[in-house]
UniProtKB/Swiss-Prot annotation:
<comment type="subunit">
    <text>Component of the ribosomal small subunit (SSU) processome.</text>
</comment>
<feature type="region of interest" description="Disordered">
    <location>
        <begin position="281"/>
        <end position="310"/>
    </location>
</feature>
<keyword id="KW-0539">Nucleus</keyword>
<feature type="region of interest" description="Disordered">
    <location>
        <begin position="147"/>
        <end position="209"/>
    </location>
</feature>
<dbReference type="GO" id="GO:0042274">
    <property type="term" value="P:ribosomal small subunit biogenesis"/>
</dbReference>
<keyword id="KW-0690">Ribosome biogenesis</keyword>
<feature type="region of interest" description="Disordered">
    <location>
        <begin position="349"/>
        <end position="370"/>
    </location>
</feature>
<dbReference type="GO" id="GO:0030490">
    <property type="term" value="P:maturation of SSU-rRNA"/>
</dbReference>
<dbReference type="GO" id="GO:0032040">
    <property type="term" value="C:small-subunit processome"/>
</dbReference>
<dbReference type="GO" id="GO:0030515">
    <property type="term" value="F:snoRNA binding"/>
</dbReference>
<comment type="function">
    <text>Involved in nucleolar processing of pre-18S ribosomal RNA. Has a role in the nuclear export of 40S pre-ribosomal subunit to the cytoplasm.</text>
</comment>
<dbReference type="InterPro" id="IPR016024">
    <property type="entry name" value="ARM-type_fold"/>
</dbReference>
<keyword id="KW-0698">rRNA processing</keyword>
<feature type="compositionally biased region" description="Basic and acidic residues">
    <location>
        <begin position="33"/>
        <end position="42"/>
    </location>
</feature>
<feature type="region of interest" description="Disordered">
    <location>
        <begin position="20"/>
        <end position="42"/>
    </location>
</feature>
<feature type="compositionally biased region" description="Acidic residues">
    <location>
        <begin position="154"/>
        <end position="164"/>
    </location>
</feature>
<feature type="compositionally biased region" description="Basic and acidic residues">
    <location>
        <begin position="182"/>
        <end position="192"/>
    </location>
</feature>
Amino acid sequence: MAGSQLKQLKAALKANGLIGQTNIKKKNKKSKTPSETRRNDKQEILSNIRKDFNLFDGKINRTKRDVTMIQGGKFVKVGSKQHSDATRAKSDVENSMKLQYELDKKQHGKTGGLVDRRFGENNRNLTAEEKMLERFTRERQGTSKKKINFALGSDDEQDDEDNDGFVLTHSGKSLSLDNDLDDSKSNTKYYDEDSLMPEEVQPKRKSKQEVMKEVIAKSKFYKHQRQMEFQKAQDEIMNLDDEFGDIMTEFNNNPAKKPQSFSNKTPEEIEYDNKVRELTYDRRSVPADRTKTADELQKEHDTRLQKLEADRLRRMNGDYDDREAEADDLEGFWNGSEDEEEGFAIDNSAEEEGSSSGNEDDMDQSKPSGRTLKKTIIQIPGTHEDFIASLSSVDESNHCNYIKKVIETYQPRLAEGNKERMNVFVGILFKHILHLANDPCPPAENINETMKILKKLSESYNEKLVEVIRVEINDIQERIFNLQPRDLVYFVMVGYLFSTSDHYHLVVTPTLILMNESISSIPYDKKTTVSRIGQGLFIVDILLNYQTFSKRFTPEIVCFLEKAALLLIPEPEKLTNQSLSINKIIKSDTNLRTKGIKPTEDLVKVSELFGNDSQVLKLKLTNKLIDIFARILSIWRDNEVMIEILSSFSNLANHLSIHYNSPKLNQLIEKMSKIQNNLIKERKPLTLQHHKAISIATFAPKFEENFNPDKKSYDVNRERQELNKIKNQIKKERKSTLKDIRKESKFTARQQIADKKDKYDEYHKKMANIVNSISTIEGAEKNTYEREKQRRKNK
């Protein structure tokens, strides 16, 4: 085992020849003692011994596995002595940079110290004797108090002042060097402009380097100005902060003003003040709007329609505000299109088209011009049962007139609470239309007129209407497998009253879900009746009306049309199910017979959809099915899935044309084939992205015949080799210097940012303390005022 630290130290000193006998004659002259040849290396040997014995100064990183890294251009093991030395050197550099930054920060903005202004101190071209001689001469000239009266090198003005106006002259001319200089200047003042060449007149164009130097100089100048202004502002802030304490002391020392005593007014004066205050808020008379011309009214109407159309397009694209939907948002949704009522003959579409673009002028023609209140003779119903009871005493042809009279009597401007009554009445009208639709023989004219009135009223009163519609949606959901005539009329009314092209709607969206669920619930089996198929076709026609503007694809429609066609066309078992979504084709009683088929153009009535099955109803539904196929071609023509849709529809249409001879069907088949061929040509299959082929780079290997790993250059010219060596050294030193400069600048920038953060934090903390102190004083004064007020009030 090794001895103690003292024994190890003595052994190391003796081994290096620093202690013990040193005059022993050694036969081996290679290892000589320091006293003989290495006396100058004594300090180096001692420093190495100290490093070996000061083990706590070295940092050793223990690693699980041996890892090497490049340190100083060499491979160094991580955690070894070389790596620790490099890490220590790096930390020493950072510490020195930090100390230098702190020193510069302390000396920033300070003046003082000794400046050596002796002559020639920084001039290396002068010898020591020349410097001393020049200094002695200047010292003698400065200490000499006696001045020469006539100095040839002095100015005339100074001579006149110093010599009482006497000037050294010769032949009447002053002997001074300034005159000669002036003469030389005056001689060169005049010149011949024609003798100058154009090249001499034109200024020299600056090089790019000169321009960049000028830009950098200006940038530094402006940056220095900004720093000076910022420093000046900081000094002013510090001065204000120093004076703030004195200001607050003065404020606190000032006695608080006594609050004014409460005025003791008489009851008459208080009443008079209240009357004056009431008159202040009275509404003053304003000039009435002038009567507008017909052109101006038409222009306003067109502007309103354009705004409603723009809002409809925005809602169709799903551009909504980031707020919750409200019932009042339905105000702008009543701009339903008249084209959305096409399809089954349940009402008079021509009258609806004429009334949809109108306004409430026809309703207001019978109104009096004044604002006098009428005597309420007609009672507005509160429930649907009361409304039916009131209509029982009125002739059926006058039901619409009775409704108009109720609306005219209970206008919101006539009495308070009429708006709430009208909201309830609109919901009653909606229920009444559905009630009429359930009659065995519904009055079509009354239903159409009532729907027109309801459309106009729904623009102003829609709160209760939305609640009634949601209740109706829940009722239809419960009887989804056994629909009633009122349910089909409800689907039509929603498309008539609301805008169905919106991306999301409070009423239309739940109705769409309900309609899709209804047609999806119709099964493809032998138990399905013709009436159920007709109800599904009716709902599909309404769905297509809903999507006239938005043209959204609905997969439930395609699936149901395939099932309906297979249940109606004759001999469906002869079809192949390759292009159909149905796996097994069945034959049902609902299929048309192969004999006695006569195409018809008659429309289907709603009452027929809830009657008995017949051959005539099957023919009408087949004709309606062909019309729906044609509408799908026009609505979904630009859809990407149209090729797959047409592949199934074209097979069904071709099979139907064998037994159902109709010009409409033949035109449909021809149109389907053209559209399908065009879409197939336009469709491009997905392909990978094509890139230009890049060849593999090849290089011819270069071999040196006289290769030597110790040689760094194979240049024969010795001078050029030395020059290249110097250039490489300069380049290496330049890169190293730039690296150090960048490192130092980054370190300085980090330190400056940290100082600014500390300064800002200190400033904000100080301002927060000031604000808190002011708030405390204000709160105390407020509490004092409240206590005084309460004390006087209790007296």
